[in-house]
């Protein structure tokens, strides 16, 4: 009897202390699934860009909000989602792991490591889709970001916080310029993010290997959404990269981000939009493709001092077809960015590397970030090249040229030889200024064109190894033009070196 009373008392006590916790879940059902997209009914309160969870813990993103159906892109193989599957709202937007732990790592578009190294600490996360800094949170670009490439730093300079497009046909050296820019940030306290969209895994593996070999991977994060990845992951990759870069920018750091390339990103978004049955527009791209790219690139900025003064410098890459920069996506991105570096395949095939078309390349804000000394040294370069290109076109008609015209042609050929540069060998600002002084003061006129490569190599070695001359160079103030006396001393040393070189006394 007592035993029955005890059991009854225990049950009564459990009932009195029971706290019923009711969990509400917004759930729906998959109506149609195919090609990586599911149409779902029953979760009408879902937000745009919200994560939803299918059975088997498969995630998707709500990208189409209609009256009765929700268009969801599936973030895994569509074989794991079936018609009739249950879908649950997560009430959270997609986010990615951020922080210094990502330096030296290779991750996918969701922030999951794919380099075989240790797992990441996921306690620090940031939303992939965030708003760009407001106008009041920014300031004008006034600090230079050196690429180490003479033709770029002198003619189309890039500033921290700028968006500079690299555009050209395939196999013209677009990625090479971007990677060289990353290599040149070593020791400059600039973090780098390289986003590979639709690239071959083998090509990205070579890039990662090069960065590691050159000691650049330690300040770089690589995000890979390869050609074999699903369209949703290729679409998300650049926004993931921007979120990672924004974390560092808000921590008062300077960041360089490469989007390689936005042509493939546009194709991935077009694929998604057509599968979601959105109306196609020009070249079958959806109507909001301009918004997608402007929303992405506007997240690159130079923050004001009140916001910490951090920056994101973006180098988006666009691939053209047969040099057509008037196509839809190229014109879109050209109008969004602060300038473009146009690479021409004819220049590349003729051996001019980097194959930059000076006439079509421009930097709209970068000159404000150049030092006064660099501005002075490069002031006559663009004019010399413009005169050369004009005369070169005229000379093709077989007209007889006077001595002055022939001098301009010869000088232009030599300038282009000076501008040639091997990849993975960036030049310091001092080295660039010394080469530009050669051009500015017409000292290359006494050299033969075929001897320019050998002369350039010997001259740069002389600048670094001759103690007295090196002291003069190191005393140059980048914020001021050269004093006449200092310039005269430097020119005398250079002239003496050229005379020795022409006599064959320099090896």
Curated annotation (Swiss-Prot):
Keywords, comma-separated and alphabetical: ATP synthesis, ATP-binding, Cell membrane, CF(1), Hydrogen ion transport, Ion transport, Membrane, Nucleotide-binding, Translocase, Transport
Membrane topology, record value: Peripheral membrane protein
Main location: membrane
Binding of ATP, residues: 168-175
Coiled coil: none
Family under the similarity heading: Belongs to the ATPase alpha/beta chains family.
Listed name of the protein: ATP synthase subunit alpha
Organism: Mesomycoplasma hyopneumoniae (strain 7448)
Gene: atpA
